[in-house]
Structures are given as structure tokens and as C-alpha cells.
């Protein structure tokens, strides 16, 4: 019974390309089949302006709600309350995104956060950078990376196979959906702020993409960008 319900939910989540009416040139090219790989868009630096592009090119994307909070701001008519949702999306195979959405209701806030996370999607570099392992398979990160958001700072370190994700629940969710299986983390600042913690972890993963490597180093580290075949 539970399996049937899960299958029905999966069918509802399936993206209907035929019903989609793209609003941008890239969206039209994706619908026509001219662009069939999301790596082409990312490598060319083309802007992702429609979340439906990600739905069409990455159908195996998963979503996880990290936090939903009631936030308030002062107005001349009094306090105004809204819900703020933090969401992480990823396919557990080299792609991840983090987003935040606000609305007067929980549902629209989560949907906005999911759309924002899809538009912030990045490729993640994976490999084996731990001196204790050296297996060359893409189970960890290739080298140390740092990220920050607000007062929160996160440092990611490569770990040998079998260690798992030694991190807080928020960082563990982001790293897990990125496809990283083993990593150590160091955190500084007020990590109770879920969005800042998630964004700092996401920033650290993004900073992996700005390190230049020689072909020999890539081979030694087992460095892979994006989807691992």
C-alpha cells in the first residue's frame, strides 16, 4: 500500500514537457530538444531563469525541506507575519541547489523556495582527496573548501571511504543530495540559523569549482564534475 502511494506521488511530480510554455530562449531550446544536457547551459554560463528547465533536464531531482519558520516585520499598521522556508534540491549525483522562499502561507513559501533552489543549481566536484584513502573513486571531495553566509562559516575536508558525513543535520542534507558520501566538516558561528548554515555549505561546494587542477592531479584525485556515470 505504501509503495503504491509512493508511486502515485512520483507520477504527480513527473514534469509534463508538452504542457510547459517556456518564456525564455533557453527554455524554448530545451523544449525543442536543441539543448538536452544541463552541463551545456552551465559550461556556457547561460542564465537559468525558469525552474522548468531543471525539471526537464534533471528529472531525478529530489527535494528536502530543511526549515519552515514564522518571521515578522514591523509595519506602520503593526506586525506583519510571513512564513520562511528553506529547501535543498539535488539528484545525489553531482548537482545541488539551496533556496529560500517567503509567503503568507506555508505551501506557497515552500514552492517559492524549491523554485529558487532549482535556479541556484550548481555542478559539484567530487573525488578522493584524503591522504588516508587514495582510492581515486568519487566518494568524497577532492580538496578542502570553505564557505560562509552571515556569521556562519563552514570548512569541508576530504575523508576516507567509510567515514560517512561527519556534519550537522543541515550540512549533511546538502552534502547528501550533492552526492558526497564521506566528508569531515568544521563549523563556526551561529549554526542555529538554518538558511545561513545551508547556504554556507552550498558556498563551500561552489568554491570547489574555482580551483584549477592539472590533468595529472585530476587523475590522481579521481576528480569528476557533475554526474558520475
Curated annotation (Swiss-Prot):
InterPro entries: Ribosomal_Su5_D2-typ_SF, Ribosomal_uS5, Ribosomal_uS5_arc, Ribosomal_uS5_C, Ribosomal_uS5_euk/arc, Ribosomal_uS5_N, Ribosomal_uS5_N_CS, Ribsml_uS5_D2-typ_fold_subgr
Methyltransferase as UniProt keyword: no
MF (Gene Ontology): rRNA binding; structural constituent of ribosome
Domain S5 DRBM stretches: 61-124
Keywords: Ribonucleoprotein, Ribosomal protein, RNA-binding, rRNA-binding
Family matches, as SUPFAM superfamilies: dsRNA-binding domain-like, Ribosomal protein S5 domain 2-like
One GO CC term on file: cytosolic small ribosomal subunit
Annotated domain remarks: The N-terminal domain interacts with the head of the 30S subunit; the C-terminal domain interacts with the body and contacts protein S4. The interaction surface between S4 and S5 is involved in control of translational fidelity.
Subunit structure: Part of the 30S ribosomal subunit. Contacts protein S4.
Function as written in the Swiss-Prot or TrEMBL entry: With S4 and S12 plays an important role in translational accuracy.
Family: Belongs to the universal ribosomal protein uS5 family.
Name of the protein this chain belongs to: Small ribosomal subunit protein uS5
Gene name of the record: rps5
